[in-house]
């Protein structure tokens, strides 16, 4: 509900609300494809949940295809039906969110290899 903010300038709105306003502005053009760059960037947990709701609603209710770049894998898994994981310009995996998130190449790129973890443990001991 944005009624309380209707007379404020966009710049004076809280960051999370500004992101929703930006999303609404983009939807005014009635696009068939919506490109989102890090839609959860700078948002707190509650605002990220709201963003997930809006993205799902855009897809389901308006039938708009959403293509986004996002590092928050939790958000990705909730709103995406297809995921492409990349690292330094190289495609690591493509498919359903769970398939991609559990792909060994993706896990290694985000968390490091088992050898890296073992080496860090030895150094810490």
Language-model-detected regions and their locations in the chain:
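Glycine-rich phosphate-binding loops of nucleotide-dependent enzymes
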Residues: 1-125
């Amino acid at each position: 509900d944005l009624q309380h903010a209707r007379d404020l300038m966009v710049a004076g709105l809280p960051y999370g609300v500004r992101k929703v306003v930006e999303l609404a502005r983009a939807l005014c053009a009635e696009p068939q494809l919506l490109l989102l760059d890090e839609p959860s960037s700078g948002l707190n947990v509650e605002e990220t949940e709201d963003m997930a709701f809006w993205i799902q609603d855009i897809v389901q209710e308006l039938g708009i295809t959403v293509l986004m770049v996002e590092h928050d894998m939790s958000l990705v898994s909730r709103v995406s039906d297809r995921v492409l994981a990349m690292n330094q310009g190289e495609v690591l995996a493509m498919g359903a969110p769970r398939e991609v998130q559990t792909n060994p190449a993706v896990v290694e790129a985000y968390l490091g290899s088992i050898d890296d973890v073992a080496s860090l443990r030895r150094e810490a001991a």
